[in-house]
Amino acid sequence: MSDVKKAVLAYSGGLDTSVILKWLQDTYQCEVVTFTADLGQGEELEPARQKALKFGIKPDNIFIDDLREEFVRDFVFPMFRCNTVYEGEYLLGTSIARPLIAKRQIEIARATGADAVSHGATGKGNDQVRFELGYYALMPGVKVIAPWREWDLLSREKLLAYAEKHGIPIEMKHKQGGSPYSMDANLLHISFEGRHLENPAAEAEESMWRWTVSPEAAPDAAEYLDLEFERGDLVAINGTRMKAHELLAKLNELGGKHGIGRLDLVENRYVGMKSRGCYETPGGTILLRAHRAIESVTLDREVAHLKDDLMPRYASLIYNGYWWSPERRALQALIDNTQESVNGWVRVKLYKGNVIVTGRDSKTDSLFDPTIATFEDDQGAYNQKDAHGFIRLNALRMRIAANAQTKRG
């Protein structure tokens, strides 16, 4: 293989990346650095360190980093400033995590003198694109090793056989032959793919869901939350200020209890195929609804409509892996500028899978003027006669077109 001296592997400690670790050592005969990111996935990460040590990885070459605050503060919250949704439904929980992982991998590569990076994404999915676009944007000359595009371990059986041959621990769920869901989790969401979900007509099993109760099993009593925003970002829940990752974790807890945030969809992958996935995004679902509500009283109409026009493009950039692109950065600068006035509070009611906005206001930036909007006597604040000329001017082009149509017969 090509001359690789040291490679930084995005390492979860699971079967796939453990096989990759051994394969890198055998195939490239290079030194391997492992990097495990804590993005709030709720798993114990120390076992990844112990597994890496068993593969002969030097202690100084094992990185387990708590990235929860950076993830929410610098990636999730900026994305939600745009009310970002891909294809009308998906809140991009997996997509938004990949640029941070790529960033940290490159930082570690520079710090350790590595000349290569590696990941465990398959050649069929979006993640290979997301990781590698990030690598090249941040370290143009880096060597990228994508084992799923190189090796011949193209079935679960071959992967298990390789693991057994090389003494790689195999979790009981794999030994029992049941093909588990392919899952990805972080503070924003948990996703499920595979098994019977590959039939888009089949309903997901209730036992699959991890973070949320079913709406039918949710409490019969609604729960109200007051959410405070500053410059478009959530800063407090019910008057209690917390760090960004703590806020999202709290919303996940509250939303999950009320059956909020389940999603079952078929999406268009960047590589060209359609795939079916199920997602739980309780906190993100609450955050999206509340953010739109505070914008409704603080954003100028045309600015709000411009954001809505740009959002699908922004969402596609994130979904397709272009977080580090100049066009995403340019859009972010515009979006962030619009958020200077997005300050205030929103009250939501959580009830059996629903997020219902019941109030919103801003003491400093509200554009809602009750003296003009009232249905009662406005004491001359708005002259209704002004509407006559406004309507006639806006109808002019349609009147001209209608007259022309009449002449044509």
From Swiss-Prot:
It comes from Aromatoleum aromaticum (strain DSM 19018 / LMG 30748 / EbN1). GO terms for cellular component: cytoplasm. ATP binds at A10, Y11, S12, G13, G14, L15, D16, T17, S18, A37, G120. The lineage of its organism: Bacteria, Pseudomonadati, Pseudomonadota, Betaproteobacteria, Rhodocyclales. It comes from the Bacteria. Belongs to the argininosuccinate synthase family. Type 1 subfamily. Keywords: Amino-acid biosynthesis, Arginine biosynthesis, ATP-binding, Cytoplasm, Ligase, Nucleotide-binding. L-aspartate binds at T122, N126, D127. Pathway: Amino-acid biosynthesis; L-arginine biosynthesis; L-arginine from L-ornithine and carbamoyl phosphate: step 2/3. L-citrulline binds at Y90, S95, N126, R130, S182, S191, E267, Y279. It is an enzyme of class 6 (ligase). It is found in: Cytoplasm. GO terms for molecular function: argininosuccinate synthase activity; ATP binding. Pfam families: Arginosuc_syn_C (PF20979), Arginosuc_synth (PF00764). InterPro entries: Arginosuc_syn_C, Arginosuc_syn_N, Arginosuc_synth, Arginosuc_synth_CS, Arginosuc_synth_type_1_subfam, AS_cat/multimer_dom_body, Rossmann-like_a/b/a_fold. Its EC number is 6.3.4.5. Its main location: cytoplasm. Homotetramer. One of its GO terms (biological process) is argininosuccinate metabolic process. This is Argininosuccinate synthase. It catalyses: L-citrulline + L-aspartate + ATP = 2-(N(omega)-L-arginino)succinate + AMP + diphosphate + H(+).
